[in-house]
Amino acid sequence: MNRSHRHGAGSGCLGTMEVKSKFGAEFRRFSLERSKPGKFEEFYGLLQHVHKIPNVDVLVGYADIHGDLLPINNDDNYHKAVSTANPLLRIFIQKKEEADYSAFGTDTLIKKKNVLTNVLRPDNHRKKPHIVISMPQDFRPVSSIIDVDILPETHRRVRLYKYGTEKPLGFYIRDGSSVRVTPHGLEKVPGIFISRLVPGGLAQSTGLLAVNDEVLEVNGIEVSGKSLDQVTDMMIANSRNLIITVRPANQRNNVVRNSRTSGSSGQSTDNSLLGYPQQIEPSFEPEDEDSEEDDIIIEDNGVPQQIPKAVPNTESLESLTQIELSFESGQNGFIPSNEVSLAAIASSSNTEFETHAPDQKLLEEDGTIITL
């Protein structure tokens, strides 16, 4: 009677598959429908639920019919494991931080281990675990030039990483104007420029940005038509992984692409930037000369600071003006006005605006200083 009952139950469960999972010294058994095993993510969640480890990252492996321990990490090898299970699917679970990756491979389950040798062998003579090179984790990303294959040679897209470092981004930006050659003639358009680099900052240490580089995009968003404050907010919001597209002031150091197979960040295609004319005519108006009084300073110590302004004599002031004019006339044409410091942009987006007294000469049209 009992035997016939078992036979009947077995014939009625031909569509089910028994699963035996092992996590540490703990074993669990459950059943799945062989015809509808579901997806790997569902199976992964089921294993976590059965073993009561919902917040633990694990590696899942299974024993195939040849005695090999093979990984299960996607839908394809999960369905392969289900199809080869006859009649039992044996699952082995390891914590990721304690996983032995050398256990995966051919004949890994049928090899006999000499337990006595392992017990008697001193710890200093034990075999060290293999170095994992197939599943790297926590690589430190570095700043780099990206999207060389889709940008014009006159443009440069720079990715600045603050990952794992407390270095500030370390550059100042300002608004100004440049004169571009268009089919309709010379056209004066507003723009955002890098005015200064902070020694020891991320921008200077990487060497990817320079003074007077014109900022065209911030993380795939064009800065054309945006104010200096808006561009500053965009950079602050993306300071941990800042991607800036610039037109370098020194075009001789541009990266010349010789292949269409170089890496791409997938951030955005530059159909709009392809329309930018490559030749820029210098234009500088003395009455719009850059003034330290119009600087906006971003600091990370919570104390607003005003850039000190030296008062030279008339003779040295005239010579300094001539030097600035001769230097800036060889770069992209611009007419500087206001300036924002990104010397110490932090990851926090909490921004305080403090209004200064009327006797303080700082950004007269706004009367504010940005403090991080």
From Swiss-Prot:
Gene Ontology biological process terms, A to Z: axonogenesis; cell division; cell-cell junction assembly; centrosome cycle; establishment or maintenance of cell polarity; establishment or maintenance of epithelial cell apical/basal polarity; protein-containing complex assembly; regulation of cell migration
Domain PDZ: 157-250
UniProt entry keywords in alphabetical sequence: Cell cycle, Cell division, Cell junction, Cell membrane, Cytoplasm, Membrane, Phosphoprotein, Tight junction
SMART domains referenced in this protein's UniProt entry, alphabetically: PB1, PDZ
One Pfam family named in its UniProt record: PB1
Ranges of residues in domain Pseudo-CRIB: 133-150
Stretches that traverse the bilayer: none
CC annotations in GO: apical plasma membrane; bicellular tight junction; cell cortex; cell junction; cytosol; extracellular exosome; nucleus; PAR polarity complex
Main location (coarse class): cytoplasm
Positions of the PB1 domain: 16-96
Tissues where this protein is expressed: Expressed in pancreas and in both adult and fetal kidney. Weakly expressed in placenta and lung. Not expressed in other tissues.
Region feature (Interaction with PARD3 and CDC42): 126-253
Biased composition (Polar residues): 253-272
Region (Disordered) residue spans: 253-292
Location of Phosphoserine modifications: S11
Protein family according to the UniProt entry: Belongs to the PAR6 family.
Free-text comment on this protein's domains from its UniProt entry: The pseudo-CRIB domain together with the PDZ domain is required for the interaction with Rho small GTPases. The PDZ domain mediates interaction with PALS1.
Oligomeric and partner information: Interacts with PARD3. Interacts with GTP-bound forms of CDC42 and RAC1. Interacts with GTP-bound RHOQ/TC10. Interacts with PALS1. Interacts with the N-terminal part of PRKCI and PRKCZ. Part of a complex with PARD3, CDC42 or RAC1 and PRKCI or PRKCZ. Part of a complex with LLGL1 and PRKCI. Interacts with PARD3B. Interacts with ECT2.
Annotated function: Adapter protein involved in asymmetrical cell division and cell polarization processes. Probably involved in formation of epithelial tight junctions. Association with PARD3 may prevent the interaction of PARD3 with F11R/JAM1, thereby preventing tight junction assembly. The PARD6-PARD3 complex links GTP-bound Rho small GTPases to atypical protein kinase C proteins.
Record's protein name: Partitioning defective 6 homolog beta
Organism the protein comes from: Homo sapiens
